[in-house]
Amino acid sequence: MSEFRKIVERILDEGDKKIFNKNGPHYNSSKDEEGIFELLKKKYPNAVQNYTDDRFVSPITHRHFQLDFYDPDSDTGFNYNKHIRHGRRKFDKNDPNCLKDIKWLESKAKPDSLYEKILHTWRDVDPIKREVAKQSGLKYIEWFNIDEFLKWYNNPELTYEEYKTAPESMQYDSDEYFKQKERHRDVYGNDTDYLGA
């Protein structure tokens, strides 16, 4: 097993321990999501966690997409896309950096590999979610790290382009991201934040 693969597997094992907080009120929620939910409830008192809606269905698989959080009063869905499968920012098929990242991921992707899963989620699934949300009239907000959430939370009128904090290229992840994660640091957000990123 390559050293890179060992690092990835250790990161994923550690992530599973954090993501699936069996003692929390919401089984499939990370500590970050629990903290985000607490803050969202201050602005959106009727918000719920782990929500599905008949308007928010994949036209390909006909399965419901899940929202991490949903506020019925403003009809707003929120997703916290911290996992690497979602990339580090929104995929844009017209962005040269995204296209370079796709080529880079494709060069590394093998069947059932992490790179293939990133391609599938970041390039294929997440853009469909955005389009389905738009077509259904659902206001849809995403964050890719805790700093983006906090920046948006303090200025909710900001657009994604105004509150994003991730680097332009995912290729940064090829070495530095996994090295930093191995040292238990979140290179895209504040590694000492109270939400446990």
Where do the protein language model's features map onto the residues?
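Nucleic-acid endo/exonuclease domains
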Residues: 2-184, 188, 197
